[in-house]
């Protein structure tokens, strides 16, 4: 309708990568059509960098992940970047896409992932490693980084599993070690400069390797002991650092946060407003990987969290709020925050 075109000038309502007969046959077709509330639409002709943000699991799991929402919002605040989402298709659509040779596509534009500049994959747990290969295979992107050309996107990995990236290093062009808010702007700016320069893919990776927190696997030689443990790990390129240091956001209060998170069409595992009240944990439990990775403890300002709650409820229509952290009971302003939220929103 005319009204729909006005509200969503570049919406996917009039275009789908999947035919109607496919959507009618598969389970939960809303996983694949895009167009949700707060999904960001842009004109491809007005941007310089296309970034596909991937959670390598089904839509219901990926849409519940706060980290994806944070980076999606942060990237799309830039006028020169369009960040879109992609998730692992369920078995039924996977089968159809292979049979009909339909390349995996982004939700917002419905364009093939292989046509993007970057494919960013968050790696939250080892059980999703096979899904990463599924994503690359369905996208028609060469599985191994060494086989990719200038026609392929750069594949970058992030998330907690990148602290031990070697098991999957051959499939990635680069990894980001640490919290994503710190260095992506520099990476995107470097890509824009490289894109029109006529330089090789390797030359861009050499530039990326100079950015703090970025690990480019092809620039390192790994040697292993007979039992499979790492024996040595040395750079083979002058631009690669001997040690890649994790990057952390010290001031989480002023870090980017999504005031308009995407609201899914279907029920997902965490279907509510999420307030990240702190990062890190004071407990130091030896069995907890996250408690070690996300040190030190950094708290968000309680007054800022109160405002976030107002804005996010208004922008989403959600009726529930969850307080997210590794140990929310250790948040120093917990009593004040919870009391305020109960009193303010009880009706």
Regions found by a protein language model. Give the residues of each.
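Short, small-residue-biased leader/transition segments that mark boundaries at the very start
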Residues: 1-13
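Active-site loops and adjacent core secondary-structure elements that bind or stabilize anionic groups
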Residues: 12, 173, 263
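Helix-enriched interaction subdomains in cytosolic or periplasmic regions
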Residues: 14-28, 78
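N-terminal [4Fe-4S]-dependent radical SAM core
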Residues: 22-52, 59-60, 217, 223-274
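Conserved SAM/AdoMet-binding glycine-rich loop
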Residues: 53-54, 307-347
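Canonical Radical SAM [4Fe-4S] cluster-binding loop centered on the CxxxCxxC motif
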Residues: 65, 267-303
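A short beta-strand-loop structural module common to alpha/beta enzyme folds
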Residues: 79-92
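Glycine-rich beta-alpha loop elements in corrinoid/cobalamin-binding modules
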Residues: 89-235
């Amino acid at each position: 309708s005319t009204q729909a075109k006005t509200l969503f000038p570049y919406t996917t309502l009039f275009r789908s990568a999947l035919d109607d007969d496919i959507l009618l046959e598969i389970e939960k077709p809303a996983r694949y059509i895009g167009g949700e509330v707060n999904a960001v639409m842009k004109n491809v002709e007005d941007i310089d960098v296309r970034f596909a943000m991937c959670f390598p699991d089904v839509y219901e799991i990926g849409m519940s992940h706060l980290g994806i929402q944070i980076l999606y919002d942060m990237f799309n605040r830039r006028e020169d970047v369009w960040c879109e989402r992609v998730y692992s298709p369920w078995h039924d659509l996977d089968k159809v896409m292979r049979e009909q040779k339909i390349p995996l596509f982004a939700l917002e534009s419905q364009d093939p992932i292989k046509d993007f500049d970057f494919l960013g994959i968050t790696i939250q747990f080892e059980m999703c490693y096979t899904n990463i290969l599924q994503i690359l295979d369905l996208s028609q992107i060469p599985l191994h980084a060494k086989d990719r050309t200038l026609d392929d996107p750069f594949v970058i990995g992030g998330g907690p599993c990148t602290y031990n990236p070697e098991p999957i290093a051959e499939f990635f062009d680069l990894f980001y070690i640490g919290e994503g808010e710190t260095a992506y702007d520099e990476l995107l700016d470097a890509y824009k400069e490289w894109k029109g320069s006529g330089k090789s893919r390797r030359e861009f990776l050499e530039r990326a390797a100079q950015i703090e927190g970025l690990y480019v696997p092809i620039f390192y030689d790994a040697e292993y002991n007979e039992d499979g443990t790492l024996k040595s790990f040395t750079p083979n390129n002058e631009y690669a650092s001997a040690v890649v240091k994790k990057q952390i956001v010290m001031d989480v209060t002023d870090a980017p946060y999504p005031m308009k998170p995407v609201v899914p069409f279907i029920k997902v595992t965490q279907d509510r407003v999420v307030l990240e009240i702190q990062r890190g944990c004071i407990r130091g439990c030896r069995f907890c990987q996250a408690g070690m990775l996300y040190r030190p403890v950094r708290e968000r300002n309680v007054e800022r969290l109160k405002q976030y709650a107002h804005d996010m409820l208004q922008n989403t229509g959600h009726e529930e709020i969850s307080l997210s952290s590794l140990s929310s009971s250790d948040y120093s302003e917990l009593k004040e925050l919870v009391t305020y939220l109960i009193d303010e929103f009880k009706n």
